[in-house]
């Protein structure tokens, strides 16, 4: 049974269409990574429209967009990765160029891995929401 993780809900200062269009092309994600981020120096990213490959320390994580529901949901599944997982990005239109956004992650983690990583995964998902909220407020 997969472990389910869910981020907090954030309000992003963009329409659901604008936000959806950013995430619907995985090449956009590679351009969002800060070039001077020290913690990512030894990590490589390669993307096309539907696929993203992340390599670090001999570990490869490959993902593919498997479902797009225009302006409301994008589903991304792992492909040939050490851990099987699914990420769902949810976009809820609030009107007035505002979108309620949250992320869900379902991962095949054993009990020990869930205990070790569960809180870190939730914190990571919440950090993504916080970052998007801050960035949208500055634009």
Model-predicted segments: where are they?
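Hydrophobic ligand-binding cavity/cleft-lining segments
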Residues: 1-46
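Beta-strand/loop substructures that line and gate deep hydrophobic ligand-binding cavities in soluble
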Residues: 79-130
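A short, structured loop/turn motif at beta-sheet edges
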Residues: 13-16, 66-71, 90-100
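Short, highly charged C-terminal tails/helix-capping segments
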Residues: 36-40, 130-139
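Hydrophobic-ligand-binding modules of eukaryotic lipid transfer/binding families
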Residues: 1-10, 94, 98, 134, ...
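Glycine-rich portal/gate segments that line the openings of hydrophobic small-molecule binding cavities
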Residues: 31, 40-82, 138-139
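Hydrophobic pocket/interface hotspot
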Residues: 19-29, 65, 76, 101-103, ...
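Short, surface-exposed coil-to-beta transition loops
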Residues: 5-7, 59-62, 83-88
């Amino acid at each position: 049974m997969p472990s389910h993780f869910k981020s907090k809900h954030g309000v992003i200062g963009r329409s659901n269409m604008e936000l959806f269009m950013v995430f619907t092309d995985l090449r956009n994600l590679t351009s969002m990574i800060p070039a001077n981020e020290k913690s990512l120096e030894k990590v490589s990213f390669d993307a096309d429209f539907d696929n993203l490959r992340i390599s670090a320390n001999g570990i490869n994580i490959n993902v593919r967009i498997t479902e797009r529901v225009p302006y409301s949901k994008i589903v991304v599944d792992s492909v040939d990765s050490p851990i099987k997982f699914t990420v769902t990005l949810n976009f809820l239109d609030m009107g007035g160029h505002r979108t309620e956004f949250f992320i869900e992650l379902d991962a095949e983690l054993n009990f020990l891995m869930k205990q070790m990583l569960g809180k870190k995964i939730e914190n990571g998902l919440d950090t993504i929401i916080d970052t998007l909220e801050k960035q949208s407020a500055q634009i």
